[in-house]
UniProtKB/Swiss-Prot annotation:
One of its GO terms (molecular function) is ATP binding. GO terms for biological process: biosynthetic process. This is Uncharacterized protein YqeC. InterPro entries: Mur-like_cat_sf, YqeC. It comes from Escherichia coli (strain K12). Pfam families: YqeC. SUPFAM superfamilies: MurD-like peptide ligases, catalytic domain. The lineage of its organism: Bacteria, Pseudomonadati, Pseudomonadota, Gammaproteobacteria, Enterobacterales.
Length: 256
C-alpha cells in the first residue's frame, strides 16, 4: 500500500505505457469528473487525450475543444491533434447532454495514428453513488485496455434504496440487500467480484481498477483485509481510494 500516490504509479495501473491507450470508466456518479482528472494526468506526461462516451453525458463546460461528427474514424488529422479534446456524435439540447458512439466506432477510431489516449464514459448512473449494470450495460469497446469501476464510498454505513442506487433490482440481486438496509464494505466487494457486477462486459486481458470515490468521508469504515479481497483473488489489478474533487485525488493505492 502506498499513500499520497506518485502519478507515474497510476499510469502503470492504467496500462497507459502503451499507445494507443483506451480507458473505459463505468459504475456510479463521479465518472465525468474522473475522466477530466485522468485527461490532465495523462496529458501532463505528453500524451494527446480524446474524451468521448458510448452512452450520454452532460455537455462539457471546460475550455477544451469539442468536435461533433458521425464517424470519428474519418475525422481530419487536425481534429485529433489537440492536447485534450472531446468528440461526440450529437448534441441533445433539451437534455443538456451529448450522445457518443458505438463501441465499434471507437474500436475503429483507435486505429488512427494520432490517438495516444481515448477516455470513455461507458456507463450511466443518473448521478447516483452506487450502480449495478442492467442487461445491456455497460457499453465497453473491445479495444479497452483498462476499465475503472467507480463507487461512492460515502454510502458505507448508510441506508441504501432506490434513492441512492441506480438499477436497484440488479444491485439487490448481487448483494442480497433489501431496501433501507445498511451498506457494508462486503456489499461493495460482492459488487466487484460478481460476474454481473461492476466489471461486467470487461474484455479479456483488460486491466481492472476499482475506485472508491469520496473515500475521505468514510475512512474509518474500511477494513483493509476485506477491502483487499478482490486484489488477492485477482479480480482487479489495483484499488484506488480518494476523492476526485480533492487534491490529491487518489490518497491510497493498493496493488499486488
Amino acid at each position: 500500500m502506498k499513500s499520497i500516490v506518485d502519478p507515474s504509479a497510476l499510469v502503470i495501473d492504467l496500462g497507459a505505457q502503451k499507445r494507443p491507450t483506451v480507458i473505459s470508466v463505468v459504475g456510479a456518479g463521479g465518472k465525468t469528473s474522473l475522466l477530466f482528472w485522468l485527461a490532465e494526468l495523462l496529458q501532463a506526461s505528453g500524451r494527446r487525450v480524446l474524451i468521448t462516451t458510448t452512452t450520454h453525458m452532460f455537455m462539457p463546460t471546460s475550455h477544451w475543444p469539442v468536435v461533433f461528427c458521425r464517424d470519428p474514424a474519418m475525422l481530419p488529422h487536425a481534429s485529433l491533434t489537440s492536447p485534450i479534446s472531446f468528440c461526440f456524435h450529437s448534441w441533445k439540447a433539451n437534455q443538456g447532454k451529448v450522445q457518443g458512439f458505438t463501441p465499434e466506432a471507437i474500436d475503429a477510431l483507435v486505429q488512427r495514428p494520432e490517438c495516444d489516449v481515448i477516455l470513455i464514459e461507458a456507463d450511466g448512473s443518473r448521478g447516483m453513488p452506487l450502480k449495478a449494470p442492467d442487461e445491456h450495460e455497460p457499453c465497453i469497446p473491445k479495444s479497452s485496455c483498462c476499465v475503472i469501476a467507480v463507487m461512492g464510498g460515502h454510502t458505507l454505513g448508510a441506508k441504501v434504496s432506490t434513492e441512492n442506487v441506480h438499477r436497484w433490482s440488479q444491485f439487490a440481486d448481487i448483494t442480497g440487500l433489501t431496501p433501507d438496509a445498511t451498506l457494508q464494505l462486503s456489499d461493495l466487494v460482492a459488487l466487484v467480484r460478481h460476474p454481473q457486477g461492476a466489471f461486467k462486459n470487461v474484455p479479456q486481458g483488460c486491466r481492472r481498477v476499482w475506485f472508491i470515490n469520496r473515500f475521505s468521508q468514510c475512512e474509518n469504515a474500511i477494513a483493509q483485509s476485506e477491502l483487499l479481497q478482490p486484489l488477492q483473488q485477482h479480480d482487479v489489478e489495483a484499488i484506488w481510494l480518494g476523492d476526485i474533487q480533492e487534491h490529491p485525488a487518489i490518497a491510497r493505492r493498493f496493488v499486488n
